[in-house]
Every structure is written in C-alpha cells, then in structure tokens.
Amino acid sequence: MAGWSRIVLVGGLVALAAAEWHVGAAAQRSEVAPADQYVDPSAGPQFTEGREIYQQNCAGCHESGAGRAPLRFVLLQLAPRAIREALTNGAMRLQGSGLSPAQKTAVAEYLTATKSSAEPPAPPPYRRCTGAAARFDFAQPPAYDGIGLNPSGDHAMPDRVAGLSPDQVGKLRLKWAFAVPDATRLRSQPALAGGALTFGGSTGEVFSLDRETGCLRWMFKASAEVRTAVLVEHWRAGDAKAHPLAWFGDITGNMFALDAVSGRLRWKRRVTDHPAAGISATPALYKGVLYVPTSSLEEASAADPHYPCCTFRGAVIALDGKTGRTLWKRWTVGEPKPLGASANDTTKFGPSGVAVWNTPSVDVKRGQLIFATGNTYSAPADAMPPWSNAVVALDLKTGRERWHNQLTQGDLWNYGCIVKVAKVNCPGEGGPDFDFGAHTVVAHTARGDVVLAGQKSGVAYGLDPANGKVLWQTRLGRGGATGGIHFGLAARDGTAFVPVNDIPDPNVNGFPISPGLYALDAATGARRWAAPASETTCAGRPRPECMPGLGAGVSTTSRLVLTGAADGHLRIYDAANGKVLWDMDTWRGFDGLGGIDGRGGSIAGAPAPVLWQGELFVASGYGFANRQPGNVMLAFTAR
C-alpha cells in the first residue's frame, strides 16, 4: 500500500514484540517469531530517559498484563504523538499529570521506538466532500435511535430499513474504507442521518462522512477520545429549516452538542468534577432528554501504592438536550469518606466505584430508565445504596429509584489487587471484577416484557420490569475480568442473542470456556441454539491479541444476526439456527480514501454493525485490553 499509515510503520516488529514484551510472555509467544530472533527496538541509549520513566511509572501494569492495561507490543504500534495525547488528555491523563511535557515526550519515544524528530509527517488532508455529497439531506432523518437502535435498546433493525435478506448476504462487497491516522481503536457506533455517517475515534475527533462516497463533510475535535456513539436529533422528513443537534461524550467527562449539519459546537458541558471520571457508554436519548452514564479510570490509578484510593462514584445524569442543563442526577453509591491510612501511610477513601459502563434502556411503558452497574473500588462492600453489580430502574422524570437487584455482592476490586507493589490498595482479597458491561434490553415476548442483562460472570439474566425480580438466569460462559458477556445484547421476536467473550482467566475456573453466540428464549432463558466461536481463525496470528471470543455489540433483523469478534471477523448468522451465512476477515490492511491507508483489527466494544438499505457499516480495531489495534470504518454494499 502506497498511502500514509503509522499503525503498520514498524512492520514485522509488531509480531516479534508480541513474543517478549511482558512478564510471563513465554506462555503467549507468537508462533511466527522465535524468541532468540527478537531485539528490543528501544534498547538504545537515545531512549534511556524514557525507559527510566516507564520503569518507574508504567511498567507495573503494562508489563504484567494487569487488567486492561495494553501490553508493550500494543504501545509499540503507536506514533509518539498518540502516546503524548493519552498522557495529556486521554486514558492516562491522571498517570501523566505528574510528568513534564519533556518527560511525556521521552516516554512516548521509548514506547514507540521512534524519536519525535523521525516521527512520520502528519497525514494528508482528508478527502473533502464537494457538490451534492457535501449537502445535508433533510429527507433522511435518523434511521435509528441511539446505540441500541430504539429506546428499549434491543438492537433490532426493521427489515424495511436494513434492506438485507439472507439471499442477498452473499452479494456484500467492500464499498469504501475510511482510516483514522494514529487511532488504535474505533469504539463509536456510527449514526445514520442526513445522508451522513457520523462517528468518533480514539484520537478525539468526530467525523461526519457522506454515506455514499465516504468523503468528509465535517470534522470536530473534542477534548479526548470519543467512545460513545453520536446521537442525532430527529426532525420531520423534508423540513429544510430543521436544525438538528448531534450529541456525544468523551472520556474526560464532557458532553457536547454540535450542529448536525455543519459540525459547529452548540454547547459543551462537563457532567462530573472527578478528575478520573469519563463517559464511556453512549447516553440514552428520549423525548429530548439525554440520560448520561458516567464511568471512571480511577481503578487503574490504584496500581500506584501511594495513590489515595478511591474517591470516584458513578452516576446517571439527565440533561436537557437543547441546553445541556441538568434536570436530575443520581449517584450510584454514597459519598466517599476517609477510612484511615494504608500501610504506606496514604489516606484511604470509600465507598467508591459503581461505574455505569453501559447505555441505559428506556422502558417506555412504565416510564423508567434501566441500567446495570460495575463493581465497588474500595470498602465498605455493603455501601448504600447497594447498587454495585446490580440492575437498577429509575423514574424517567425524577431519577428516583423504582427498584434495584444486586446480582453479585461484595465485588470490591481495583488494579491494586493485581499489581504486587500496590496490594495496599486492594480491598481485602479482591473481588472477581464481574461488572455489567453490556447494556440492558427491554425485550418484548408473548408472555410480557422482560429486562435482559448480561454479566462478565458469563451469566445472562431475565428480570421482571415491574420489580426487578429474577425470572430466570442462564450460565453461558466461564466468565472473567475481560470475559463472559462483555458488551452486547440483542433481542427480536422473543429471542435474546447473547455474545460470549470467554478467554483463559487464571482466577476463574469450573465452567468450560465457551466463546460464541447464543440464542435464548427471552421469556424463559432456555437455549435455542449455540454458534461456538471458530477455533481456527487465530492460527498463525500472535496471542494474546487474537482471541476468538465475541465481545462486540450485536444487531439483528427478523432473519439475520450481525456481530464481530476479537479475531477480526465480521459475521452474519441465520437468526433461526445460528448458521454463519457470511464471514469477512477485517484483520488486514485497507486502501483508505484519500491515500490514508489503514488496518483492521479486533472488533470489540459496545458498537454493533449497522445496516441501511442493503449497506453495512462497521468499525474494525480495538487496541485495548490486549486486543488487536485498528483504525478503519468500513462500508459494504449488497446493491
């Protein structure tokens, strides 16, 4: 490929690095690179300062594989400017707060084995739209409502909108690829409105592309990585005087409202004051109100034995979409208070945590907002309200609790539990880290509505929407800190579709590791079919970044189920029996538009594939939790 691409600049070093960069890597060595052939590309004296900073501040997590911290081979694939951005405004901003700009540059150069003076030039400008492609189409209001595609969050696409039948699946072909330079992941499900495809990226930009050609209509620079989908306000089809807004959040806790036509900023609001707080999950949008869930990176800060752990607490905030004004705010746990000193004479705080990693679903019939929560970061385990690892329902208008059901008790966990030098920050023995990462779904069945929830423990639940009582629970996988039911759920015509991301986890035993896609009776939890993950697609590819598990969002029509996997494969299944009808390997290079080439990688995170009139859109690349990086938005067509 002749175009610009930093993600593959180091070429074969990527596969080699996977063999040796972390503690215990012998068990994970790539079959393509014998260890005795590996030479550390950043071992030279020109990287001494950065190496020392890294060893003192970063190695504890990045060389032990602690939690979701990316291993060295992932960091090696980045450009220095991407590391600097992460330390300044991104996921590592707290860890980077004590470093000077020169120190950030030094560690960025060491981690990427690239001196800034030798850094590749900025990419060529994106191909801008002209003529008809640049015009906003007021005849096309949003095709779907948010990341869940409708208020209930069931990821069901109407057949008339999707426009793809089983007999057309085999006709799908790549139409265009849009690459985002320096990005390592795309975790933003694209919005379809006004003839545009709009999404965010890990480098902090939001892009609005012409859906037909992939050219750039506008681009907006946010404060940090955008992991949420972009929500576009509805308007009456054909109303050329409409001024729809486009909303999204970034991982530093800012909500933005843009003019959906031009990309100009209308308002910006930081929804929480905690320095580690962010917005990872897409807000729910209903009748002009944004319901914003907050999560946090603070559990990673606990890997520092001198960090005063922990003070973040999750929340859901209701905002007026037009103005950003707060309508109500509901904390998920009580206010943290000092709890004495640790063995390092550092003040401890608690309770804390209970982040909301998933998009709430709207139970329109009962006027309630339903979401699931994460674990507690610090004691006490019985903090009030007992909402950790729970499914919670709030009144849509007031935020008052309707009901809650805590499905795993006593799950206190932070990175101090897996970094030896930081054990002083681990609460007790440390819990299993069984968050609810997947969004809830209000599923409609012949027996009535059921709230679906999926946990990292590998268990799927059906709850009564009236009171939260468990109607059924079905174990599908072994589960683990990065396994089990990780992000996506879908439901259609009384069937729940559940992806399982099981990977080997030394802390979890018992049930067999069972990655794959499962169909359950949404009313009873009975298994209808199972489609185990492929055991062959990772052959010849380095571990651990290639795993066959399914940890991405799922979408469905009446006859099709679509989802991606950590092995980079995008698959379409027969909804009736789980048979794979179409399989596209995206773990490869792509000729990007405008000479900006890119690569696909793992498909993971909350975004799901989206269909519109026989065209399929999906992001590939998930440089997180040691999955394969990538930087492309792909468009396929069966027309």
Predicted features and spans:
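Electrostatic cytochrome c docking/interface patches
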Residues: 28-53, 124-125, 130-133
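Repeat-blade elements of multi-bladed beta-propeller folds
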Residues: 141-149, 183-205, 224-255, 278-308, ...
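A structural motif specific to WD40 beta-propellers
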Residues: 173-175, 215-218, 264-268, 327-328, ...
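Extracytoplasmic electron-transfer domains, predominantly the class I c-type cytochrome c fold
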Residues: 28, 40, 69-117, 368
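Blade/loop signatures of beta-propeller domains
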Residues: 124-174, 337
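Surface-exposed loop and turn segments in beta-propeller and other repeat-based domains
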Residues: 179-180, 270-273, 329-350, 402-431, ...
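The canonical Cys-X-X-Cys-His
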Residues: 50-65, 83, 107
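Beta-propeller blade signature
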Residues: 258, 312-325, 386-400, 513-525, ...
